[in-house]
Amino acid sequence: MHAHTKSTAAALLVACALAAPAAAQPVPESPDALKFQPLAFEPPRARDHRVVLKNGMLVYIAEDRTLPLVSVALTIRTGSYLDPAGKEGLAGFTGSQLRRGGTKSLTAEELDEKLDYLAAQVGAAIGDTAGSASLNCLSDNLDESLKVFVEMLREPRFQEDRLALAREQALQEMQKRNDDSAVIERREWGVLLYGEKHFSNRFTTDASIKAIGRDDLLAFHRKYFHPANMIAAVSGSFSKAEMLKKLEAAFAAWPTPKPAVPPVDPAWESAAPGVYRMQKDVPQGRVSIGLVGVKRDSPDIYALEVMNEILGGSGFTSRITRTVRSNEGLAYSAGSGMGFGVYSPGSFRASFQSKSRTVAYAAQLVLEEVRKIREQPVTAEELETIKNNLIQTFPSQFASRGQAMSIFASDEYTKRAPDYWTSYRDRIRALTVADVQRVAKAHLLPEKLILLVVGDQKEIELGDEKHPVKLAELAPGGKQVTLPLRDPLTMKRP
């Protein structure tokens, strides 16, 4: 026998001997019997990554050398809530045209070509209460990519032909506002919950879009775009010290006044409880059921999150999904969500889409599940399942350095409680069956529910022969209102 053959045989014998005890371990009868050690995970601390540049810009920064990439994501203190009356859409155009409209030294076409050459992805947008801008590039191209990115932010061209194209596209999109029942439902649900004057319901019109010119974009940009008005989340393949030097240099020439940005007006006004019906010739009706809830600083948010997961937020294991979809087969998608607002209260919303004839019956089933979770304690098994799921999936919030930095930047912008992430799992772990029932009783108030039904109202009213339920029977206080569709260009009702 050759020497290498003897060595191989000896190695195999040793391997078999070592493997024998493992093979002797009992095999679990099912995956449920598998045992795992608890995952030891502590979220990163924001203060370990927070830096203030000389110009006042806040930066959350972390090295991540897993790929040769760099990410810079900015949050800018601005928003469409700042649109002047009669020029709704100005903030949105300012955000989109930052990227699409060129820079001081580059036409829009040259900017496109430059970014393609650098293999850099750049974006910008402005939403209701914040603006954003992002750069993702190869670490080898960082210097040139960052230079172009900062010029775009500081000295946008807002090229006239690109703005004209964006204006024309916006007007064309307006024509489609009533084409999709899902779009109608989402739009009108927000108005029913918070009212026409809420910052989230400032609709663009054909008149407001036509009133916006290049000078308006320049003035809006000049007023709100300054380094001290930005928070950056930076991660990637770099030396932290070197990256901070690059950021200091890139933004050094930008004037640093911090504008007094008006605060968001949180005022809201819900419609009266009842059933609100909107006619749309579609084979399936869309239904939203809910009410305004609490802000993010409420001590009840943890119990409400768990309550909603049990009721309709956890997919096939949740009560609404199981009852409406799995047991009755009335909807492909049915569930609920619970949001917690930063400026105004968030909301609870249960929703589904069902055949017209079964809309009322499905709505009755959802309301019955709401009643049950108020009046009957959830089971210990339901509670533990949801608590364990929330605790075990918690680390995924911080799956990458980039995600973590973005969370810290968002928290700084919205002033989230500093201990939220460090205390989250303990607060979830401490919840009891009584806590869940308490918040259900306090916040899911049947007499205050709003029901929005979008679909073929004649078919919906005919109902299901096996389950002859009428929407009028479900209306809180017996109130029923028919809402006509808005004119897509003026957003006025006839």
Ranges and model annotations:
Residues 80, 288-292, 312-354, 407:
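A structural supersecondary motif
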Residues 31-51, 190-230, 262-267, 394, ...:
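Histidine-acidic residue clusters that define the catalytic metal-binding segment
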Residues 9-20:
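Bacterial N-terminal signal peptides
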Residues 26-29, 34, 231-295, 453-494:
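An aromatic/glycine/proline-enriched structural segment found at the starts
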Residues 100-106, 136-167, 314-315, 339-397, ...:
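M16/insulysin-pitrilysin zinc metalloprotease superfamily fold
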Residues 73-136, 199-203, 314-330, 342:
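M16/MPP (pitrilysin/insulinase) zinc-metallopeptidase core fold and M16-derived inactive scaffolds
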Residues 169-188, 266-285, 322-331, 376-427, ...:
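Short acidic/His-enriched helical or mixed secondary-structure segments at domain edges of catalytic enzymes
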Residues 26-31, 106, 111-220, 266, ...:
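Acidic/histidine-enriched segments that form metal/cofactor-coordinating
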